[in-house]
Curated annotation (Swiss-Prot):
This is Transcriptional regulator MraZ. GO terms for molecular function: DNA-binding transcription factor activity; transcription cis-regulatory region binding. NCBIfam families: division/cell wall cluster transcriptional repressor MraZ. It comes from Pseudomonas fluorescens (strain SBW25). It is found in: Cytoplasm, Nucleoid. Belongs to the MraZ family. The gene is mraZ. PROSITE patterns: SPOVT_ABRB. InterPro entries: MraZ, MraZ_C, MraZ_dom, MraZ_N, MraZ_sf, SpoVT-AbrB_dom, SpoVT-AbrB_sf.
Length: 151
């Protein structure tokens, strides 16, 4: 499971180093093979270990293809998915087109989301985090299914 927000840097070629605390799990689970694609909701990228991505593909494949909403989601997620592999230094290259989508420059945030990571531009992450915190603190903003969650 992947947790926490990690400040990272992209080099001039668009490579980033996976934080060392995640590398062993990624190597044992998927031999360091990753899939990166766009997030269809937020202006960031999603990075999946290959085994997790294969579960997503199975679910996407099972969606009825006659529904435009399903085809749209399949096009966005699968059409933008790129196979990656951690190199010997634990780095991977974020393709230019995906860097442009997420507006990634030098400073970024790699955010653990249990089964995947989100990769954000640092300023965008700071802004969405502040907005999320403000929104959830509003009276009545907590959904019913979260009210019973003990943190």
């Amino acid at each position: 499971m992947f947790r926490g927000a990690n400040a990272i840097s992209l080099d001039a070629k668009g490579r980033l180093a996976m934080p060392s605390r995640y590398r062993d799990e990624l190597i044992s689970r998927s031999s360091g093979q990753l899939i990166i694609t766009i997030d269809a909701v937020d202006p960031c990228l999603c990075v999946y270990p290959l085994d997790e991505w294969e579960l997503i593909e199975t679910k996407l494949r099972a969606l009825p293809s006659l529904r435009e909403e399903n085809r749209r989601l399949q096009r966005l997620l699968i059409g933008n998915a790129v196979d990656l592999e951690l190199d010997g230094s634990g780095r991977f290259l974020v393709p230019p087109r995906l860097r442009e989508y997420a507006k990634l420059d030098k400073r970024a945030m790699l955010v653990g989301q249990l089964n995947k990571f989100q990769l954000w531009d640092e300023d965008a992450w700071d802004a969405v985090s502040a907005a999320d915190l403000a929104a959830i603190q509003q009276p009545g903003a907590m959904p019913d299914e979260l009210r019973d969650l003990i943190l």
